[in-house]
Amino acid sequence: MSILAYQPLNLYTNYRDAAEAYPDVPIIHDEILPAFPELGYRSTYHSSHEIILKRAYQLAHLGVQAGDKIIIYKSSKFDTYLLATAAAYLGAVPAMISYHFPASTIEVFVDRLEDPYILFDEETENRVAAVKNSSPNKQIAVRNLLLQPAEPVGQTELPHDQISYMTHTSGTTGIPK
């Protein structure tokens, strides 16, 4: 019996490896993804990987870099995961947060993550505007991200023993942990 060896999770590296191993595997979307409209309704691992890199370069242009935390607070679509993968390419630490949370809960995240970037869309735009403790220059609307130049930058991997991805649970209190 073969036992799989432990490999650390890196969202970007795992996606890249899949794209290299299976470049022509189709990915079918049931809608145009707001943060990845170039993918249309049908793409492949290879083509989606290329656009993930473009989004990473655009995030870098806006100042996102290794070690930064970035809340991804947008409508529930597959592009949320793709944006987290782009952030991971830069060595930033994505925190994918449910778009159902009110501004007051996002303020708790902002405190706990020490003024992270917040990437948002039209679904969460008004709530982000109501967040009082977030630096405005760290608030990135998806529609503005898409307009940024995409100058290539290298991948940065965090040390394997460092947190590279965050999820949350609200438990019974409604406050993120």
Residue positions per predicted region:
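Conserved AMP-binding/adenylate-forming core of the ANL superfamily
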Residues: I27-G63, I71-K77, L83-T85, P102-E107, ...
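Conserved pre-ATP/AMP-binding loop-to-beta segment of ANL
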Residues: P23-P26, E151-H168, I175
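Conserved S/T- and glycine-rich ATP-binding loop of Class I adenylate-forming
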Residues: I70, A87, I163, T169-T172
